[in-house]
Every structure is written in structure tokens, then in C-alpha cells.
Design a protein with these regions (language model features):
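Rossmann-like adenosine-cofactor binding region
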Residues: 40, 55-59, 173-270, 288
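Rossmann-like dinucleotide-binding domain for NAD(H)/NADP(H)
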Residues: 90, 166, 224-320, 324
Length: 355
């Protein structure tokens, strides 16, 4: 099995893939037309990516491609519709970077509450201003609002208890019973959450429904001077509305993600939101700890191992996991003429309905 790794990837992961008997092509700077070309040239069966975009054009001539593994959680950089149309499975590594992202989110919260960045800049410029920086509000006794209660959101809740904070959360799948089990309060809406929270942390996957989710009405409901943190995807926030909230309500923002980010590891960053007073930004590195990347590498190897051995795809995001049928038949063959016809004929002869 030929595996093309088109992003930076842990050495242990490359070793693990080779140990499976895979032919590993490690080309961590592929993107755009170059990626499309290499997929066509190599006839790779598996593509592993982190931040590289996998477009419909990239998959169009990738005749050998059967599986795309996103070495991370979010899959918004992969054209799922195009992949599904070409019978290419897409898998991810959910939950493996949850602790890392939660740690950065809390780092941003603390940095905003204690104005750590402003203090560091003043000290570097030879300015001592203890009187100004002694005005921090503090976190203990306050309310943390968590928007999205997946694995990262749950890690946020766990750490909030150490800060003696009350937690109110909103999720489509959260009910009062689950909230009670977690020792938190369920918000009826994101607006109710915004009204109640001293700190809001967003942990949403980017979908058609969540694009621009935190909008003008949401920021209008936030408390003046509250803290807003986004470590999910830049597109879930209406940035113009956020800028107004910063300027008009003194909302402080910690952002690890932005709607327009450079496509590579380095580049020019032109989003002026980070120049606003009260805004702290980082370089979309929430998941980028050694611990998280090691866990993701191990999960990627596991996914390829299972796929190579059985044809099944762990963590598939574009396959139906619970079809209406009572059984699933998976046929792996070498493209020989008549194989599927024989299988279907055998099923029909046995009176088995299939689709």
C-alpha cells in the first residue's frame, strides 16, 4: 500500500507506517497543483494531511486514492462532497489534541485576565506600571461559558473546576440530565450563555450551520469587559461583530484561529483584528504540542493498519455508520471483471435484499 504524507508528520508515525509494510512517500510541502500532480503520478492509495487543503481538483485524477486521513480533528480543509462522489473515504483523529487545545485556551484566558502580553511589552520597553496592571478581575467565582461540548469542551469544563468557576454550556446534544452529571448548567441558547458568562470559550466544528455562529446578536449579549476565546475555527465567528464588541463594549479576545490564515507554516499575516487593544493572538497552534502530535501519529497509524487489514475505516466522517440495513457486506477485490456480479448473484439466489 502506497501512502503519501503531504504535511509535517512525526518521525514515529512514519516509522509506524513503514512497519505496516506501506511504501511511504514523505513530501511535507505539497499543496495545490503540486499535490494534485503527485497524487496522479504516484497513484497513492492513502493520503495523510494536517493543514494542507485537499480540493476536488486534487482528487480528480487521483485514480488510486481510497482514503484521506486528516492528522487532526477538523476536516473543513477537505472537500468531503468531492471525496464521497469519488468513493474516497475521509477519516480524522478526534480527541487526540483535546488537552493541548484546552491548555492553550486557558493560557489565553489567563493572559487576557492578567494582561500578560501588555505587561511583557511594557517591561521590554523599560516601563514599570504596577498600578495599572494590579487591576485584574480574577477568575475564581466567575462563570465560564463553553460553546460546543465535544472532547475539547469537556476538557475546558474539567479545568474550570480547578479555577473554582461555575460552568454554563451550550451544545445541540446537551440536555439537563447530562449537564447535571457533569456538574454544569445548560444554557437554553448561546445568547443566554453570553448573558451569563464572564468568559466565553468556543469549541465548534466548522459546518454550514456554524459558519458565523458567533454573530452581532451573540456579542451584543455578552457582558461589557468579558473575555472571548476562540480556538476552534476562525469562520465560526463574525469578525466584524467581534471588532465592534472589542471597540464598543471592551470585550477582550484571545484568538488562535482566523478566517484568513497563511496556507503554509510561514507567511504574511494581514488580519488587523490582532492590532486592537485587548486582543491577544496566537498562530493556530492549539493542537501543536509534542504530546498531541505523538498521539495523532499513533492514531493515524492505527487507522491505516485497520484499513489495510480489513478495508474498514475507523473514524470515517463521510460514511454512514448506522445504515438502515441489518447487515453490512464489504467486498475487497482486485478490479477483476465479474467479481461483483458473482457476489450480487449469490446474494440474490439466497433471497437476500441488498442495496
Amino acid at each position: 500500500m502506497k501512502v503519501l504524507v503531504a504535511d509535517k508528520f512525526e518521525e514515529s508515525g512514519l516509522t509506524g507506517l513503514k512497519a505496516l509494510g506501506c511504501e511511504v512517500l514523505y513530501e511535507p510541502k505539497l499543496e495545490g497543483d503540486a499535490l494534485a500532480g503527485r497524487l496522479a503520478q504516484t497513484a497513492a492509495e492513502v493520503l495523510v494531511v494536517r493543514s494542507t487543503k485537499v480540493s476536488a481538483a486534487a482528487m480528480e485524477k487521483a485514480t488510486g486514492l481510497s482514503l484521506v486521513v486528516r492528522a487532526g480533528a477538523g476536516v473543513n480543509t477537505i472537500d468531503l462532497v468531492a471525496a464521497s462522489a469519488r468513493a474516497i473515504a475521509v477519516s480524522n483523529c478526534p480527541g487526540k489534541n483535546s488537552v493541548a487545545v484546552a491548555e492553550l485556551a486557558w493560557g489565553l484566558i489567563l493572559a487576557l485576565d492578567r494582561r500578560v502580553v501588555d505587561q511583557a511589552v511594557d517591561l521590554r520597553n523599560g516601563v514599570w506600571n504596577k498600578g495599572e496592571y494590579a487591576k485584574a478581575r480574577g477568575l475564581s467565582g466567575g462563570t465560564l461559558g463553553v460553546v460546543g461540548l465535544g472532547s475539547i469542551g469537556k476538557e475546558m469544563v474539567h479545568r474550570a473546576k480547578a479555577f473554582d468557576m461555575r460552568v454554563v454550556a451550550w451544545s445541540r446534544y446537551l440536555d439537563d440530565s447530562k449537564a447535571a452529571q457533569m456538574g454544569i448548567c445548560r444554557a437554553e441558547s448561546i445568547f443566554a450563555l453570553a448573558l451569563a458568562s464572564d468568559v466565553v470559550s468556543v469549541h465548534l466544528a466548522l459546518t454550514k450551520e456554524t459558519r458565523g455562529f458567533c454573530d452581532a446578536a451573540f456579542f451584543g449579549a455578552m457582558k461589557p469587559g468579558a473575555i472571548f476565546v476562540n480556538t476552534s475555527r476562525g469562520e465560526v465567528v463574525d469578525e466584524a461583530a467581534l471588532k465592534r464588541a472589542v471597540a464598543e463594549k471592551g470585550v477582550r479576545a484571545g484568538l488562535d484561529v482566523f478566517e484568513k490564515e497563511p496556507s503554509g507554516a510561514t507567511g504574511t499575516f494581514e488580519d488587523d483584528v490582532v492590532s486592537l487593544p485587548g486582543v491577544v493572538g496566537t498562530h493556530h497552534v492549539g493542537a501543536s504540542t509534542e504530546q498531541a502530535q505523538q498521539a495523532i501519529a499513533e492514531e493515524t497509524v492505527r487507522i491505516v493498519r485497520v484499513f489495510k487489514a480489513t478495508g474498514q475505516v475507523p473514524n470515517a466522517v463521510n460514511l454512514c455508520h448506522r445504515p438502515p440495513a441489518t447487515a453490512l457486506v464489504s467486498v475487497r477485490h482486485r478490479g477483476r471483471v465479474g467479481v461483483l456480479a458473482h457476489v450480487f448473484g449469490t446474494l440474490s439466489a439466497a433471497g437476500i435484499n441488498f442495496g
